[in-house]
Amino acid sequence: MGVEKTIITQGSGPSPQVGQKVTMEYTGWLQKEDGTKGDQFDTSVGRGDFVVNIGVGQVIKGWDEGVTQMKLGEKATLHISPDYGYGPRGFPGAIPPNSTLIFDVELKKIG
């Protein structure tokens, strides 16, 4: 599957290019068997925006691919398969091995 993006709110700006700094707000959940959101494992809401250089391996592959498909101001849901997430290792204490992940992401700033 890789990453599947569903737009919640259309953006009107450009899409980030590989290596550009992006500022985002996000919440992540484990996907349940029925494909819906399960347990929340992380959020930037209330903690401050998340800033990263996108497309260069600083985050999971699903984010590198999904966020570069977004436009500035866009809010989207990313469904990320295990091979584009944390894979067979998972993330100890938060994400079990081979978990499909769901992220709601807002692309707030590029550069």
UniProtKB/Swiss-Prot annotation:
Protein name: FK506-binding protein 1
Gene3D superfamilies noted in UniProt: 3.10.50.40
Gene Ontology molecular-function annotations: peptidyl-prolyl cis-trans isomerase activity
Residue ranges with Polar residues bias: 7-20
GO cellular component: cytoplasm
Similarity remark: Belongs to the FKBP-type PPIase family. FKBP1 subfamily.
Domain PPIase FKBP-type, first and last residues per copy: 19-111
Organism: Gibberella zeae (strain ATCC MYA-4620 / CBS 123657 / FGSC 9075 / NRRL 31084 / PH-1) (Wheat head blight fungus)
Protein activity control: Inhibited by both FK506 and rapamycin.
Keyword Zinc among record annotations: no
Principal localisation: cytoplasm
Catalytic activity: [protein]-peptidylproline (omega=180) = [protein]-peptidylproline (omega=0)
EC supergroup of this enzyme: isomerase
Keywords carried by this UniProt record: Cytoplasm, Isomerase, Rotamase
Function comment: PPIases accelerate the folding of proteins. It catalyzes the cis-trans isomerization of proline imidic peptide bonds in oligopeptides.
Locations listed in the record: Cytoplasm
Region (Disordered): 1-20
Record-listed E.C. numbers: 5.2.1.8
